[in-house]
Regions:
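N-terminal accessory beta-strand-rich subdomains and adjacent acidic, glycine-rich linkers
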Residues: 1-247
Length: 248
C-alpha cells in the first residue's frame, strides 16, 4: 500500500510505501487487495482536564481501507483521519484466524519529502534525547551528525541519518511540516531514518534486547503516524491534532 499528502496545490508527502515486516513470518508489506472502504465525518468538542483552552474541537474526515493479503488470507486495515492541519494514520488488525499472535521486526512507514527542506532535528538515539537541536537542510544531516552528538553517559545512535520525532521542517515555498506520532501504547517509539539520496524518511522503531520492535495480538493497532502541515508556523504550536488522536 501507498499514500500521499497535499496541502492545497502543494505536495507535502510524495507517494510513500506502508507496511510491516514480521519476524519469522510472511511480511505485511505487499500483495494486498482492497476489500472495502468506509468514510465518515466526525465533529465534536471535548474539554480537557487541564490545558491552554477549555474546549477542543475534534473535527476530521476519516477513511478506513480494509485490505486482504490473498496469499495468507490475512487482513490489515489502514485508518486515515484528515484534519484541517494535517493527517493521522495507523495500521489496524481485526480478529482473524490467520493472524493472532505476531512479532513486528520492522515497520516500513515512509514519508517521501517533496524537496530538500530546512529541518530542526535531534540525532536519533535509543537512550537519550539530551541533545541540542541542529538546523540544516535534509541533505546536510549526514554531514552534521557528528557535530550534533554531545557527550552523554548513555548513547546509542542507530544511523548517520537517523533523527528523533517530532521532526519540524520548513519548505522553500513556506510550508511548515511536522512528523510525529500519537497514542503510543504497547508499541515501540518511532524515530526516522533518512534516505538522503532520495529524501525519504522511514520509521525506525526502538528494539528490545533481542531486536524485535513490537509484540501484538489481534485485535490490535499501531500508534498513529502524524503529519501536521500549515503555511503559518504558529499553527504548529496551536494544533490539537495529536491531542485529538490520543484517545482516552
Amino acid at each position: 500500500p501507498t499514500y500521499s499528502l497535499s496541502f492545497g496545490d502543494k505536495t507535502v508527502i510524495k507517494p510513500s510505501k506502508l507496511g510491516l515486516e514480521l519476524a519469522n513470518d510472511t511480511d505485511l508489506t505487499d500483495g494486498f487487495e482492497l476489500v472495502a472502504t468506509k468514510e465518515l465525518t466526525f465533529d465534536d468538542t471535548w474539554q480537557p482536564v487541564w490545558g491552554e483552552t477549555k474546549d477542543i474541537r475534534n473535527h476530521y474526515n476519516e477513511l478506513l481501507a480494509e485490505l486482504r493479503q490473498p496469499s495468507t488470507g490475512r487482513l490489515m486495515n489502514l485508518r486515515f483521519r484528515v484534519y484541517d492541519d494535517g493527517v493521522g494514520f495507523r495500521y489496524e488488525f481485526p480478529v482473524q484466524p490467520n493472524l493472532v499472535y505476531f512479532v513486528v521486526a520492522e515497520e516500513h512507514t515512509q514519508f517521501a519529502m517533496a524537496g530538500d527542506h530546512i529541518a530542526w532535528w535531534i540525532a536519533g538515539d535509543y537512550d537519550t534525547q539530551e541533545y541540542d537541536y541542529t538546523e540544516s537542510r535534509l541533505s546536510e544531516i549526514r554531514g552534521k551528525m557528528a557535530g550534533a552528538i554531545s557527550d552523554n553517559a548513555s548513547q546509542t545512535q542507530f544511523s548517520p541519518t537517523g533523527v528523533q520525532t517530532s521532526l519540524q521542517m520548513k519548505t522553500d515555498d513556506g510550508l511548515y511540516i511536522n512528523i510525529h506520532e500519537a497514542a503510543l501504547v504497547d508499541y515501540s517509539c518511532m524515530h526516522l531514518n533518512l534516505d538522503d539520496k532520495n529524501l525519504v524518511f522511514e520509521s525506525w522503531l526502538t528494539p528490545d534486547a533481542v531486536g524485535n520492535k513490537a509484540y501484538m495480538q489481534a485485535p490490535a493497532k499501531t500508534p498513529w503516524r502524524t503529519v501536521m502541515v500549515s503555511d503559518d508556523a504558529r499553527q504548529m504550536l496551536a494544533s490539537n491534532l495529536i491531542l485529538n488522536l490520543n484517545e482516552p
